[in-house]
Amino acid sequence: MTPRHIAVQQARRIVVKIGSSSLTREDGGLDLNRIDSVARLVSAKARRGCEILIVSSGAVAAGLEPLGLSSRPKDLASVQAAAAMGQGYLMARWSSAFQAHHLHVAQILLTAADVMQREHYTNAMSALDKLLAFGVVPIINENDAVTTREVRFGDNDRLAAYVAQMVGADVLVLLTDVDGLCTAPPSQPGARLITEVYATDELGGIDVRGAGSSVGTGGMATKLHAASMAQHGGIGVILTSADRLNEVLDGQPVGTWFEPTRNRPASRTLWIAHVAPSAGQILIDAGARRAITRGKKSLLPAGITDVLGVFSAGEVIDIVDDSGLIARGISRYDSDSLAKLMGHKQEEKQKEHMRPAVHRDDLAVLVQE
């Protein structure tokens, strides 16, 4: 058996994300047959002992027809109105579809602000855990009716990756309207499906343009980012067409499989690495980089060469060097204090200097060396 087949067959929890393009008909209305099909397949997998969460787009698309709109509006207020109109209809359809298989669903609407704040993040995690314990299928969506343009996920691919990390999922399934990740846009001659992606693979040269839709917000670039985020969090990812969900849940080799990293970080480390907003940035030297990446040590002020931005002690900051982002962590100093201490080795500052700027327990290293 392949690693993918083993991962899916042995999965305790799976997050399935289905986008607007896969949930809507050509005329823009909800594809009720698709919802019924997903509910049937998920219910069958649930009966075999797997807990499944669904991240469902489609609220805005469901609200277009009642509001007399033919395509997704551009202004935020109209998007919010369509989401408010469509979310209730969307949930009613999911509820009806799962009731046919004797399962209940629960609506969970999240905003980017919810997951960025640690307390809100842990509360959402606890609520999802409890719903799964009750045998309920959570249906999760971004709360488009109250989000702001500045603070929002922007697409449900990232939301699905956050949810997968939040609940400790074993597998994340990203369903879309193409077969998987290809070497070029699928419409181009010679484009080939990439069947497997490993954490160390370099994908920067792949052209992922042109895979969006008129009713959704997420293209292939956002799916690739979400897949990478989950993959580096120890979660296997399958990216494929919504038409292949039956084969996906059976562990068959369809779409693109993102092999997870071997060691799964703790939930708090994942939150620091991928979710918490950055309050500032510090630049470190080569010795400090070796200490935190290879030596698994805390970051000391002596290894810091510059402090950028204004932040307080207890906030998450980016740790960079000349090559780019190395790690993220919770600073034990405010920016002014850190700027005064960085690089100092004088005897009179030795005691303060030896206190970590970022303790290793508060550090999420993002590079592999």
Residue ranges and their predicted role:
Residues 2-72, 76-104, 108-369:
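C-terminal catalytic "cap/lid" subdomain
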